Swiss-Prot record:
It is a multi-pass membrane protein. It comes from Sinorhizobium medicae (strain WSM419) (Ensifer medicae). This is UPF0314 protein Smed_3089. The lineage of its organism: Bacteria, Pseudomonadati, Pseudomonadota, Alphaproteobacteria, Hyphomicrobiales. GO terms for cellular component: plasma membrane. Keywords: Cell membrane, Membrane, Transmembrane, Transmembrane helix.
Length: 196
């Protein structure tokens, strides 16, 4: 075996371990959400691939919904963050950083403090937290966005993010930008517009 071949084997082994670490973080997220008392699936008792009604008790309970694009954009942003902070490090290491951040958010988002904040400051009056299925899929959507961003030119990734924001903003009067704005600095005018 040559030195180059040994080096490639080490890189592949390290990448595999980092990907396993990503799965371990996701498993830990699932365990913590379970210990927090989150439901595995929608209280309705069935699973939908798509929940198209944003202002419903089924939102954030199924495989995907109008907030899935926000999690894809998280992946775009976390790829950029990893590129800045971990330049020269393996893609799998940057994905691990992104997975840790997203999983931490998914856990925080499902605490009573954040659920109550959503209900008091935003139009999400029917929001009672995510099902474990939905939260897991949100993290996988982030990973998908991360991998998309790793393959596309920056300009294309930015264009996709803007298109997703405009589309969801038009369709349901909510998106990642408005979600962050209303959580951090609620505005009555925005809340009234979102209420339709």
């Amino acid at each position: 075996m040559t030195i180059a071949a040994g080096s490639d084997d080490n890189r592949q082994r390290r990448a595999a371990l980092l990907l396993l670490a990503c799965l371990a973080v996701l498993a830990l997220q699932i365990l913590v959400l379970h210990l927090m008392g989150r439901l595995w699936i929608c209280e309705c008792g069935y699973i939908k691939l798509w929940e198209g009604v944003a202002k419903s008790s089924g939102n954030s309970q199924h495989v995907s919904d109008w907030y899935t694009p926000s999690h894809i954009i998280h992946g775009f942003l976390f790829y950029g963050l990893g590129h800045l902070l971990m330049r020269g490090k393996p893609l799998s290491g940057r994905l691990l950083l992104a997975t840790v951040i997203e999983s931490a958010w998914e856990i925080l988002e499902n605490t009573p403090m954040v659920i109550n904040r959503y209900r008091s400051a935003t139009i999400s009056l029917d929001y009672f937290g995510d099902s474990i299925l939905n939260s897991t899929m949100d993290t996988l959507a982030m990973a998908t966005g991360f991998l998309i961003a790793s393959r596309l030119p920056v300009a294309v990734t930015v264009a996709i993010a803007i298109a997703l924001e405009l589309f969801t903003g038009f369709m349901v009067r909510d998106n990642l930008t408005l979600n962050v704005l209303m959580l951090v600095w609620p505005m009555d005018a925005v809340k009234a517009w979102q209420a339709g």
